C-alpha cells in the first residue's frame, strides 16, 4: 500500500505506511507475510502437546486451542461474519477471549477490543462509529450482565448480531453451538490487513480506534518477546485486562503463545488471588500498573507468600516511582522491567541486562532499532539530552493514523508521519526515556486513560448542570484521580446524584469522577477559557495542606 500518512487506505479506511517505509521494514525483516492465526498455527505445530492456556476450570494444549479456534472460526463464518467485517469484542479475561480473537483473526474480521469495564455508553459508541456488524459478549462480566445492553444494541440498530459466550435467548445467539462446526483450515486474513482495533483514551468523547495490522503488530509481539526473554518455559499470568495492548501484545498473552509458553488466566489482580496462582502454577512473568504493584509490595511484606518462581515483573501504564521500584526485587524476589508504551505503537522497555540505575529511574528505551524518536519543544524543535519536551515517534509498529478520523490525524501526526503522543518526557544520551507528564487533556487513573471531554459532555447534558469541567488531581496510589467542577442550575444536584446519573448513562465506573465539587464559577485564562491549570493547582495545594 502506498498511501500518505494522513490518507486512508482505499481498502480499510485507515492510514497506512508509505511505500518507501513498507519496503524498508520488509527489507529489515521486521514485517513478515503472516497473520496472527498463521502464527498460532506455527506455534501449535512446534508444541502440540504443551499446555497453552489454563484457568481454574480448564487446561488446553496448543493442539486443542488451535482446533477450538478453527471450529469457532467456521461457526462464526456460518453465522454471517466475513473478511472485512468489524465486531465489538467485550469479554472478561478468559480462554474464550483468546479463542474468539484468533477465530476472528483467521476470518479477517476486525475486533474492537473493548475493556470489561466498558458499559453501554462506550459500547454503543464503538458499535456505531465502527459500523460493527456484531457485538460479542458474555453472560457475566465482572458482576455485570451485558445481555440487556446487547438487546438494546440490536433494538437501536447499533449492530445486527449479538453473540454471547454463555446462556442466551433470542434475539441474542449463544456461541457454544458454533464450536460444533468442522474446523476451518483456510485463512482469509492478509498480513497487511487490520488485525484489530485497540482503543485510545484520547482527549475527547469521540471514539478513537487504533488500527493494528497483522504484520506490524506481530513484529511488536515478537520483538517484545525477545527483549523480555519469553520462551517455551515462560508462564505468564494475566492480572490486567487481556484486551489491553500491554497485556495482549507487550509481549503478553500472544507473545507467550508464540514463544510456546503457558498463559495462566486470571480475572482478578489482587495479591491474595494472584499470589495463590503464582505458587500453584509456578508463574514466571506478569505485568501490572503502578497502583497494583504497590498493593502487591505491601501485601508481600506482611504475608511472605511463595513467589519463588516469579522471575520478571513488568510495570507500565504510568510512571512507577523510584522508591517503589527499589522495593520490587527485595520484596517480590524478581526482576523489575519498566515499560513505557501506548496502544498507538511505540513501546520502551528497560533491558534485562540494564544496570539498576536505568531500571529504577527510567522507563526504558525503544523496542526497535528503526523506532525514530524525537523529543520536541512547543515549536517542534528537538530538545537536548535531559531537557523536557513532547515525545513524538514514527516506526515499524507505530500507526500512521486513527481509523476514520482524517481531521484529527492532521493534528495528531506530523506531515512526515511522526505521532504526537502528548507525553512529556526527557531523554538521556543513550536514548532512555523518563516520563515527566502529559500535554493532552487526559487523565491517567491507575493506567486507565480518561478523556475529560467525554465526562464533561455527559455532565453538561444533565438538566441541573450549567457547565462542567474535569481535571486530574494527584493521588499517591493511582497516580491521578478525577475531580469534576460543576456550575449547577437551581435546585442544585448533589455530588452523589450526579455520580448516580453518570452510572445510569452507562459510563464505565473508572470514568465516573472520584470527586465532584459544586462551584459558582470557573477561573479563566486571559482569553476567557477555563483555566484547568488553576483548578489543578488548587487541588494540589489542598491535598498538600491535608497531608
Curated annotation (Swiss-Prot):
In which domain of life is the source organism classified? Answer: Bacteria
Q: What is its EC number?
A: 6.2.1.61
**Pathway(s) this gene product operates in, as recorded in its UniProt entry:** Siderophore biosynthesis; Antifungal biosynthesis
The record's top EC class is ligase
Q: Which InterPro entries match?
A: AMP-bd_C, AMP-bd_C_sf, AMP-binding_CS, AMP-dep_synth/lig_dom, ATP-dep_AMP-bd_enzyme
Q: Which keywords has UniProt assigned to this entry?
A: Antibiotic biosynthesis, Ligase
Molecular-function GO term, any one? acid-thiol ligase activity
Q: Which residues cross the membrane?
A: none
Q: What catalytic reaction does the record list? A: salicylate + holo-[ACP] + ATP = salicyl-[ACP] + AMP + diphosphate
What Pfam families does this protein's entry cite?
A: AMP-binding, AMP-binding_C
Q: Name one GO biological process term.
A: antibiotic biosynthetic process
The Swiss-Prot or TrEMBL record describes its family as follows: Belongs to the ATP-dependent AMP-binding enzyme family.
Its biological function?
Involved in the biosynthesis of the siderophore pyochelin. Specifically adenylates salicylate and loads it onto the holo form of PchE via a thioester linkage to the phosphopanthetheine moiety. Is also involved in the synthesis of the antifungal antibiotic dihydroaeruginoic acid (Dha or hydroxyphenyl-thiazolinyl-carboxylate), a precursor of pyochelin.
Which protein, by its recorded name, is this? Answer: Pyochelin synthase PchD
Amino acid at each position: 500500500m502506498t498511501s500518505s500518512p494522513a490518507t486512508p487506505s482505499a481498502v480499510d479506511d485507515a492510514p497506512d505506511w508509505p511505500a518507501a517505509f513498507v519496503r524498508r521494514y520488509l527489507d529489515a525483516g521486521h514485517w513478515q507475510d503472516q497473520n496472527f492465526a498463521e502464527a498460532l498455527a506455527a506455534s501449535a505445530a512446534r508444541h502440540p502437546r504443551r499446555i497453552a492456556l489454563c484457568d481454574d476450570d480448564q487446561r488446553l494444549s496448543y493442539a486443542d486451542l488451535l482446533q477450538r479456534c478453527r471450529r469457532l472460526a467456521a461457526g462464526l463464518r456460518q453465522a454471517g461474519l466475513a473478511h472485512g467485517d468489524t465486531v465489538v469484542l467485550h469479554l472478561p479475561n478468559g480462554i474464550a477471549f483468546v479463542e474468539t480473537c484468533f477465530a476472528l483473526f483467521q476470518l479477517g474480521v476486525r475486533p474492537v477490543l473493548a475493556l470489561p469495564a466498558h458499559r453501554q455508553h462506550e459500547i454503543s459508541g464503538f458499535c456505531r462509529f465502527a459500523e460493527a456488524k456484531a457485538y460479542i459478549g458474555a453472560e457475566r462480566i465482572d458482576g455485570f450482565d451485558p445481555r440487556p445492553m446487547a438487546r438494546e444494541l440490536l433494538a437501536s440498530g447499533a449492530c445486527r448480531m449479538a453473540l454471547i459466550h454463555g446462556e442466551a435467548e433470542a434475539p441474542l445467539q449463544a456461541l457454544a453451538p458454533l464450536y460444533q462446526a468442522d474446523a476451518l483450515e483456510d485463512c482469509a486474513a492478509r498480513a497487511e490487513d487490520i488485525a484489530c482495533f485497540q482503543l485510545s483514551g484520547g482527549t475527547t468523547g469521540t471514539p478513537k480506534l487504533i488500527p493494528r495490522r497483522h504484520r506490524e503488530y506481530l513484529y511488536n509481539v515478537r520483538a517484545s518477546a525477545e527483549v523480555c526473554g519469553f520462551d517455551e518455559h515462560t508462564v505468564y499470568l494475566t492480572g490486567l485486562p487481556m484486551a489491553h495492548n500491554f497485556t495482549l501484545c507487550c509481549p503478553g498473552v500472544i507473545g507467550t503463545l508464540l514463544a510456546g509458553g503457558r498463559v495462566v488466566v486470571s480475572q482478578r489482580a489482587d495479591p491474595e488471588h494472584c499470589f495463590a496462582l503464582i505458587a500453584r502454577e509456578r508463574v514466571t512473568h506478569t505485568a501490572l500498573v503502578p497502583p497494583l504493584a504497590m498493593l502487591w509490595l505491601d501485601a508481600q511484606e506482611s504475608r511472605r507468600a511463595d513467589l519463588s518462581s516469579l522471575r520478571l515483573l513488568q510495570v507500565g501504564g504510568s510512571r512507577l516511582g523510584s522508591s517503589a521500584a527499589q522495593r520490587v526485587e527485595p520484596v517480590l524476589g524478581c526482576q523489575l522491567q519498566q515499560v513505557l508504551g501506548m496502544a498507538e505503537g511505540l513501546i520502551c522497555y528497560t533491558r534485562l541486562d540494564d544496570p539498576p540505575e536505568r531500571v529504577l529511574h527510567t522507563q526504558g528505551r525503544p523496542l526497535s532499532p528503526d523506532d525514530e524518536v524525537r523529543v520536541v519543544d512547543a515549536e517542534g524543535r528537538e530538545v537536548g539530552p535531559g531537557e523536557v519536551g513532547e515525545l513524538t515517534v514514527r516506526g515499524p509498529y507505530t500507526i500512521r493514523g486513527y481509523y476514520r478520523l482524517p481531521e484529527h490525524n492532521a493534528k495528531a501526526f506530523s506531515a512526515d508521519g511522526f505521532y504526537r503522543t502528548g507525553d512529556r518526557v526527557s531523554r538521556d544520551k543513550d536514548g532512555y526515556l523518563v516520563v515527566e507528564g502529559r500535554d493532552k487533556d487526559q487523565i491517567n487513573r491507575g493506567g486507565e486513560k480518561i478523556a475529560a471531554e467525554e465526562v464533561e459532555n455527559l455532565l453538561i447534558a444533565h438538566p441541573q448542570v450549567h457547565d462542567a469541567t474535569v481535571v486530574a488531581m494527584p493521588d499517591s496510589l493511582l497516580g491521578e484521580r478525577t475531580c469534576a467542577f460543576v456550575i449547577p442550575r437551581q435546585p442544585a444536584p448533589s455530588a452523589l446524584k450526579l455520580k448516580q446519573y453518570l452510572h445510569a448513562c452507562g459510563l464505565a465506573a473508572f470514568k465516573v469522577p472520584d470527586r465532584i465539587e459544586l462551584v459558582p464559577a470557573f477561573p479563566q485564562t486571559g482569553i476567557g477559557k477555563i483555566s484547568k491549570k488553576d483548578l489543578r493547582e488548587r487541588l494540589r495545594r489542598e491535598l498538600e495542606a491535608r497531608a
